[in-house]
């Protein structure tokens, strides 16, 4: 399965207040832009999640949002992981504030939902995505 994961920009970002957990409540206006990574998800026989990218310095383990998305998807749905490989062709600039990792995670959640016919709603995918990062729910929509 091939999926595009689109970058997003913040057009406006206002800090509302600081929460007890140290994070801030924000009011943001965001917009998707026409820069995307190409994600390919396919089955493998390893019974594990494997990941590869075209950028050697990106993590291929739990430090990668796409990997986390797959792991959390299988936990949340109780679907046994038959083994999947995620290939990411990064075209969204890394660490540029364009939500590239979050977008990749959202694409993996949506792709696995379709692949495994899990039937999760967009709302549920967004809830799962929030466990990965604050931008993932936006990217799911």
Language-model segment annotations:
Residues 96-122, 138-140:
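DPxDG-like acidic metal-binding loop motif
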Residues 1-96, 114-123:
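ATP-binding N-lobe of GHMP and related small-molecule kinases
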Residues 121-132:
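Short, well-structured alpha-helical segments that form the helix of a local strand-helix-strand
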Residues 7, 140-141:
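A cytosolic small-molecule/anion-sensing beta-strand core signal
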């Amino acid at each position: 399965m091939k999926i595009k994961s689109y970058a997003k920009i913040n057009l406006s970002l206002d800090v509302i207040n600081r929460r007890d957990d140290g994070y801030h409540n924000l009011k943001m206006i965001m917009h998707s832009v026409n820069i995307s990574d190409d994600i390919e998800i396919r089955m493998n026989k390893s019974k594990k999640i494997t990941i590869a990218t075209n950028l050697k310095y990106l993590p291929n383990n739990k430090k990668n949002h796409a990997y986390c998305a797959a792991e959390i998807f299988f936990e949340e749905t109780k679907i046994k992981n038959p083994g999947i490989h995620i290939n990411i062709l990064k075209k969204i600039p890394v660490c540029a504030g364009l939500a590239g990792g979050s977008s990749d995670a959202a694409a993996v959640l949506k792709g696995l939902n379709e692949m495994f016919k899990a039937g999760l709603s967009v709302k549920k995918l967004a809830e799962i995505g929030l466990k990965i990062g604050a931008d993932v729910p936006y990217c799911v929509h």
